[in-house]
Every structure is written in structure tokens, then in C-alpha cells.
Amino acid sequence: MRGGVAGPTAGEPPGTEAEAEEVEESSAGDDEELELGLSLGSKKQQQQQHAPCRILTARDLQPAAALSPDSSVSSSSPAAAAAAGGKRAEGPTATTSPGTVASGHPHSSFGVVGWPPIRQFRMNSLFNQAKENTSETDTKKTATNESDVQKDKEEGEKKGRVAGWVKVNMDGEVIGRKVDLNAHRSYKTLALALELMFTKPSIGLCASHNTNSLKLLDNSAEYQLTYEDRDGDWMLVGDVPWEMFVSSVKRLRIMRTSDANGLGQRYQGIHRTIASTRGRS
């Protein structure tokens, strides 16, 4: 038939035309997807071009070995530090903020504390050395104190023992007294103090105590002042110098002259010698 739609030719198979139409439709769809992809890509490039630039800080360029004490990479290598800095510079994108930079260690923002490390044996040696110095100082102080005490003791022994407080008894008196020899510097003051102790106070005595105070040292008086030395011997007071008397006296006794006559005759020559020596001086 001449009118109407022309049918397939005799040489063409019946499904060839339909396949050709499907190929044209698929190629058209691919072209549309390609155009869509190109347009989206150009938009992303424009957004990246208009995005603000971020300045890298020291935290971004910090070496990876310094962030982790257990890392096997040495922080002293300049090549490793440069590589780590380059990776950190290229890693964050334009959309990331400085506070959201990824880190491989939770303590990446802190430096290594206690670097360089001190070995344990060095720390122990320093501690032991300080301890030895302290002990030596204490030993020297103790030795100095002991030497000072020993010196004081030797000086005291050289000067002689000071009697201090000694007992005083008087014939006819039941109760004794004590007197401090360190409070006196001569026999006269000692005799006056003993007379005031054992004699009842009266107006006449107070008026004439300067004259009566020497009676204890006089052989013609009613009472005589005697003392017992360290050897246990009884002697008359006034035979030896005052310093020797103070260092050797053990106790005092006010004896009656009749009882002390033996002591007076025994040491009569000594009294005469002392009296002549005092007269010459």
C-alpha cells in the first residue's frame, strides 16, 4: 500500500527500529547526567574558591612524636617533623574549625612533662649524697657539743669544787642550819652571818654586831668556828686561804672553846704563820 506509514523493508528485521529508539533514549539520559555532574562539579569548585582561608597554628604543626610519649618516632628528626607538619597542613579541609582538628592521642594538646628523663640510679645517688651530707653535719655538731661540755668539766675540776650550801651545827642547839658559801667572799662575812643565825636578835647585839662578829674567829671567845674537810678532819676556820677553804669544806660546826682547845693547840703554829703573812702583806 502506498498510503499510510511505511513499514519495515524487506531486508530489515522487525525489532530493529525499536532497539534504535531505546539506544537514542539511553544516550540522551547519559548526556543529561553528564551535564548535571559537570554543573555540580563547577558549583563545588566555585564554593571552594569563595571559602575563607584558615591560618595554620603551632598546634597543627606540632610533631607527632612530641604528642605521644610512647611513639617510636623520634621528635629530633627534622624530616619527620616536616612530614608531620605537611600532613597536618593538608589534612584539615576548609569546613573544619581549628578546634576540631583530628588527633591520634587524647593528650595531643599537652607537651611532654619531665623531659629529658633522669635515670633512677642518678636520682638515688643524689638522694644518698644529700643524706650523707646531713648526717656528717649532725655528727660534727654533736662532737662540738661534747667537746664543749668536756672543756667546761675540766675547767671546773681545775678551779676546784665549790661547796655551795653546807650544814652548820652549834653546840647546845638541837636544830642545825645551812649557809651558802658562794654568797660570801671572806671569813668575816661568814662569821657575821652565822652569828645572826644562831643568836637571838636584840638591840644590843644589833648595835654592836660589828665587834661581836669577829668573836667566832678569836681563840679567847666563848665559841670557835670549825669545819670538817673532805678527808674527815676537823680544823679551825681561818687556817687556809678563803678559796681553798670553800673548795675543801664539807660542813661547819660552832664549838665551845673548851672543846676546841685541842684544835687550837694543834694549829697554833699555823695561826701564827698566817698572822705574820697577813701583817707583811
Swiss-Prot record:
Disulphide-bridged cysteine pairs: none
Domain PB1 residue range list: 163-259
PANTHER family to which the protein is assigned, alphabetical: AUXIN-RESPONSIVE PROTEIN IAA11, AUXIN-RESPONSIVE PROTEIN IAA17
Stretches of the chain forming a coiled coil according to its record: none
A cellular component annotation (GO) from this entry: nucleus
Residue positions of motif EAR-like (transcriptional repression): 36-40
Signal peptide: none
Record's subunit section: Homodimers and heterodimers.
Localization of this protein: Nucleus
Keyword S-adenosyl-L-methionine: no
Any single GO BP term: regulation of DNA-templated transcription
Bias-annotated ranges (Acidic residues): 18-35
UniProt keywords, alphabetically: Auxin signaling pathway, Nucleus, Repressor, Transcription, Transcription regulation
Main localization category: nucleus
Official protein name in the record: Auxin-responsive protein IAA10
Biased composition regions of type Low complexity, renumbered to the chain: 7-17, 36-49, 63-84
Residue stretches of biased makeup (Basic and acidic residues): 133-157
Source species, domain of life: Eukaryota
Region (Disordered): 1-115, 130-157
InterPro entries: AUX/IAA_dom (IPR033389), AUX_IAA (IPR003311), PB1-like (IPR053793)
Annotated family: Belongs to the Aux/IAA family.
SUPFAM superfamilies: CAD & PB1 domains
